[in-house]
Amino acid sequence: GLWFGPRIGKRSLRMATEDNRQAFFKLLEAADALKYYYDQLPYEMQADEPETRVTKKVIFTPKLGRSLAYDDKVFENVEFTPRLGRRLADDMPATPADQEMYRPDPEQIDSRTKYFSPRLGRTMNFSPRLGRELAYEMVPSKIRVVRSTNKTQST
């Protein structure tokens, strides 16, 4: 077979354990000597023991226009409309509901609703798109649609 040379990083186990053991002993001796000389220093030059519990210092700054006291929140002169599906607290002012402001008059309800059969007890209250008023008196009852295949215009 072909020989590609020695495998890089491959060492025998016996040599690796002896090398590691010697390096570990040297590290222990160095740490022991360091501790010995550190203890010889005067007390003022020795570092204080670090605290084992790490605490994060939080500085609370309220937002502009707000105060730290929560009991002085006053909702005077504020028109508050809750989100859809939420209810207002009793002490907050309420704006009239949309159903009360835009309730259609009985004569405005279209007579076409009887043409739609209600499903599951529903009634059809037809309302045009916002900003549009439908006037069916102006629409002719019979509309004639003519299409020309030879591009002649009908009048």
From Swiss-Prot:
**Any GO MF annotation of the entry:** neuropeptide hormone activity
Residues annotated as carrying Leucine amide in the record are 64, 84, 120, 130
Q: Which InterPro entries does the annotation name? A: PBAN, Pyrokinin_CS
* Location(s), subcellular: Secreted
Q: Which stretches are tagged as propeptide in the UniProt entry? A: 12-55, 133-155
Tell me what this protein is called: PBAN-type neuropeptides
Q: Which family does it belong to?
A: Belongs to the pyrokinin family.
The record's function comment reads: A hormone that controls sex pheromone production in females and pheromone responsiveness in male. Also mediates visceral muscle contractile activity (myotropic activity).
Instruction: List every position bearing Isoleucine amide.
Output: 8
Record GO cellular component, one term: extracellular region
Q: Which domain of life is it from?
A: Eukaryota
Traced from the root, the source organism's taxonomic lineage reads: Eukaryota, Metazoa, Ecdysozoa, Arthropoda, Hexapoda
Pfam families (UniProt xref): PBAN (PF05874)
